[in-house]
């Protein structure tokens, strides 16, 4: 039997399921469950409530309190695009109902749901959508015709967190591993515009899924791409910033960029 653990959510997120802890500190412990059918789960005719219900039940049984899911992924089935690449809608006729079933399942299992809108995969393949990032008109079409109605659906879903894009750096020049690369400033603007919409149209929190610690450091890292100053340089906005950093920490480890590789800073 899994060991019982206190289920305490990150303070900046929903307090709907939060339990008080002796230390009064919050722990966001969760699982990455990005898809069942890549890019087709929501609005792509592949919704499987049994899969997600069973998965969420298992996640909860191990004491986790959050789960991360990819929504559009590379854009293969959602949102809806016109022939010239502008976004005209959220997706197919079942997009809204699929999304809200996922949201309600997470709530029923007392899980914070981190909805990752996009992935760097949108810059790969023949049907890629890198221009959604680089072309501000197309970015705006996504915000207006897909993200805005989506946020309306999510109104009141306090256990939901929005993630703009998974590992955006792999779409960005200098680090690009995709078929089409975008300028760093374009990706920052894309992220900031999504953050602005989320903050202007909802009470939800927003982040982005940086690929490495080295991209979120003004010290010994490559750059601090996602701090307030960097995002505002790319797109001046009082609210187009992140609520918290979300950094992927995976092989190869140990990394020279991890805090564990450096002596503690003096207390001032």
State the predicted function of each range.
Residues 23-33:
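Transmembrane beta-strand segments of Gram-negative outer membrane beta-barrel proteins
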Residues 132, 137-161, 165-268:
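Extracellular glycoside hydrolase catalytic/binding regions
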Residues 1-11:
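Classical eukaryotic N-terminal signal peptides for Sec-dependent ER targeting/secretion
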Residues 27, 36-43, 78, 254:
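Short, solvent-exposed loop/turn elements at domain surfaces
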Residues 49-125, 143, 147, 151, ...:
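Aromatic-lined substrate-binding rim segments of carbohydrate-active enzymes
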Residues 13-24:
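N-terminal signal peptide
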Residues 32-51, 83, 218-222:
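Acidic/histidine-rich helix-loop elements
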């Amino acid at each position: 039997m899994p060991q019982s653990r206190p289920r305490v959510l990150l303070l900046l997120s929903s307090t709907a399921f939060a339990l008080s802890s002796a230390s009064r500190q919050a722990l966001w412990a969760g699982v990455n469950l990005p898809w069942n059918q890549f890019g087709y789960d929501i609005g792509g005719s592949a919704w499987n409530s049994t899969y997600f219900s069973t998965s969420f039940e298992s996640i909860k049984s191990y004491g986790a309190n959050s789960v991360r899911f990819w929504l559009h992924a590379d854009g293969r089935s959602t949102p809806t695009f016109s022939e010239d690449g502008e976004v005209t809608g959220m997706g197919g006729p079942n997009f809204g109902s699929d999304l809200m079933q996922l949201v309600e399942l997470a709530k029923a299992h007392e899980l914070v749901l981190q909805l990752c809108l996009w992935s760097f995969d949108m810059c790969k393949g023949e049907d890629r959508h890198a221009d959604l990032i680089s072309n501000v008109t197309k970015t705006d079409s996504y915000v207006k015709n897909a993200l805005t109605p989506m946020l309306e659906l999510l109104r009141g879903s306090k256990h939901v967190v929005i993630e703009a894009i998974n590992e955006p750096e792999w779409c960005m020049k200098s680090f690009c591993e995709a078929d089409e690369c975008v300028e760093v400033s374009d990706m920052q603007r894309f992220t900031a515009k999504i953050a602005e919409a989320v903050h202007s149209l909802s009470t939800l929190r927003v982040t982005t899924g940086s690929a490495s610690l080295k991209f979120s450091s003004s010290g010994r890292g490559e750059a601090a791409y996602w701090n307030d100053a960097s995002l505002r340089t790319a797109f001046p906005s009082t609210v187009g910033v992140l609520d918290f950093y979300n950094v992927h920490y995976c092989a190869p480890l140990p990394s020279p960029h991890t805090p564990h590789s450096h002596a503690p800073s003096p207390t001032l």
